[in-house]
Amino acid sequence: MSLRFCFGPSGSGKSHRIYEEIMQRAAEEPGRNFLIIVPDQFTMQTQKDLVIRSDRDGILNIDVLSFGRLSHRILEEVGTKEMPVLDDTGKSLVLQKVAADLKEQLPAMGSLLHKQGYIHEVKSAISEFMQYGISTQDMDKLITSAQKRGALAMKLKDLKTLYRGFQDYIRDHFITTEETLDVLRRSLSKSKILKGSVVVFDGFTGFTPIQNRLIQELMRVCAETIVTVTIGVGEDCLLYT
């Protein structure tokens, strides 16, 4: 197991340098898997860039994946049984149901939830809570600290009520896309795809706590982990091992 960082300003060629290295190594080590993890919006473009750069007929041992696709790929490989995954649309529908059921317990937000886009905003907030490991107990602390700001405290109380109602509704029936990474983390050691592989993380400005936990576990399973890091303009682009 090794961890490497490639530092450089935006546009300095970090990705190009790493991709060239990965393609060369993939050709020299056909029995090793190379996984490049990028944000969702960059997967297609990264695949296209690699194919254009490749001087072979294909790149069979290189996979370009998002965190979500990595989760699907590995859980399918190891046969982990999981509950249906609730996507953003599903979350919004569940929240609409929960909000209707709990309307009397939502003095600050109850009359606003029918407005266009409001459920979407609540869903986004709850998604971030789950990504960053914020529990209803953590929200109690936020509510306490906001007591002197009456309107904010009331909205936080309502948001906590919706968050708890959402969790109660999906418990034992669904998992969210955020939770799939924790399911994946517990299954990594069973994966033959990941064992001895090289994993690259490129294009990220940072990682959530759930993603950090996954990366830590990946480092125990994979042979090598490489992370590109954007730094300020004017600083040297260095590759640290």
Describe each region flagged by the PLM.
Residues 22-24, 208-221:
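Histidine-anchored nucleotide/phosphate-binding helix
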